[in-house]
């Protein structure tokens, strides 16, 4: 198992870098991974210097012994995403849910839609498989409360810290009704793409 961070590298600049550093640092401490703070900063500096032109998806991985590696990928244009609701699998280790690790099997799906929007057994809307969820209702922006039941994303925390997003829980039946009646809009939020409109597909009754 590795820890990893997915970031946007934009002409040598990484948005929300401090949030990514804080998350991987905290997770490494919780999980007993070696993590050299000075080495991380030098490692990231070298990446930014080497790749000062172009826009990339940057994936940085950390193993238990403290070794860092990185990969760069293009970022495809994606004006919006499609998603469907899926109930969270049972008996998932909270460590896996709340830390960004390479143990991601619980998020796999058949990609009939681009994304899945996960809810728990109580019906609470949680997160997308590749980011958090932001819900626009009237002139307010909301994201579910964090209670150790999802991955706390860097973009999510940044928006909360800026006072742009309010924590509020939505539950599935009310959520679906508000989607059907166009009372809410749904967005994927993550540090790579910032904010992306998401079209939610609801099952039709036969």
Give the label of every model feature segment.
Residues 1-50, 54-57, 61-200:
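Helix-start/capping segments and mature chain N-termini
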């Amino acid at each position: 198992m590795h820890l990893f961070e997915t970031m946007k590298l934009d002409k040598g600049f990484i948005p929300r870098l401090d949030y990514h550093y804080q998350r991987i640092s905290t997770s490494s401490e919780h999980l007993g991974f070696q993590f050299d703070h000075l080495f991380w900063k030098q490692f990231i500096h070298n990446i930014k210097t080497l790749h000062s032109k172009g826009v990339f998806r940057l994936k940085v991985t950390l193993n238990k012994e403290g070794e860092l590696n990185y990969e760069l990928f293009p970022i495809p244009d994606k004006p919006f995403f499609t998603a469907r609701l899926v109930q969270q699998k049972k008996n998932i280790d909270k460590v896996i849910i709340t830390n960004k690790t390479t143990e991601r099997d619980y998020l796999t799906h058949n990609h009939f839609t681009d994304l899945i929007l996960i809810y728990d057994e109580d019906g609470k809307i949680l997160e997308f498989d590749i980011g958090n969820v932001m819900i626009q209702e009237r002139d307010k922006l909301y994201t579910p409360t964090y209670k150790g039941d999802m991955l706390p994303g860097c973009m999510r925390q940044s928006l909360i810290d800026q006072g742009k997003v309010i924590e509020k829980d939505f539950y599935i039946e009310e959520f679906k009704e508000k989607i059907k009646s166009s009372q809410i809009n749904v967005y994927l939020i993550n540090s790579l793409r910032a904010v992306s409109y998401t079209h939610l597909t609801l099952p039709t009754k036969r």
